[in-house]
């Protein structure tokens, strides 16, 4: 019964981009930089994480999860996970967006639950 009242962890996400560009004609997005996930609440164990790029407010693009985050991750209160990331994602259709955000979700328990979202960062267009 206690599992029914499990609280969503208090997490904060931050992306510090070195490269953030959408190539409209090549139908791809390239992101590189450092992704930081900070635990602003109690000790927590994170499982079944996924990352989604939200561009232009509506376009959602799945991103590969860093290797260290693919297994169960235990975070103490106030701790941070830092990963250098470098994604180049091919798109099915051209995309033009001036900014984007990265959303951290969990699919634990069979449902998609958002855990944290980065602040919007500029997305260049080529």
Predicted segments, located by residue:
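Contiguous beta-strand segments within globular domains
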Residues: 20-37, 84-85
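Enriched for extracellular/lumenal, surface-exposed ectodomains of secreted and cell-surface proteins
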Residues: 103-112
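Short beta-strand elements
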Residues: 111-126
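A short beta-turn/strand-edge loop motif at beta-sheet boundaries
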Residues: 25, 38-48
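Short beta-strand and strand-turn-strand segments in soluble, beta-rich domains
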Residues: 11-12, 58-72, 114
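A beta-strand/beta-hairpin structural motif
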Residues: 63-92
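Low-complexity, acidic Ser/Thr/Pro/Gly-rich terminal tails and inter-domain linkers that flank the onset
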Residues: 1-26
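Short glycine/proline/serine/threonine-rich loop/turn segments at secondary-structure transition edges
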Residues: 91-102
């Amino acid at each position: 019964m206690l599992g029914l009242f499990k609280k969503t962890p208090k997490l904060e996400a931050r992306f510090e981009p070195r490269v953030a560009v959408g190539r409209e004609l090549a139908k791809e997005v390239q992101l590189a930089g450092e992704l930081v996930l900070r635990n602003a609440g109690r000790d927590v164990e994170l499982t079944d994480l996924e990352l989604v790029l939200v561009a232009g407010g509506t376009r959602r693009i799945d991103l590969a999860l860093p290797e260290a985050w693919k297994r169960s991750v235990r975070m103490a209160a106030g701790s941070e996970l830092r990963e250098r990331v470098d994604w180049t994602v091919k798109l099915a259709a051209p995309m033009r967006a001036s900014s984007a955000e990265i959303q951290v979700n969990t699919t634990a328990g069979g449902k998609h639950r958002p855990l944290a979202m980065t602040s919007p960062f500029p997305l260049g267009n080529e």
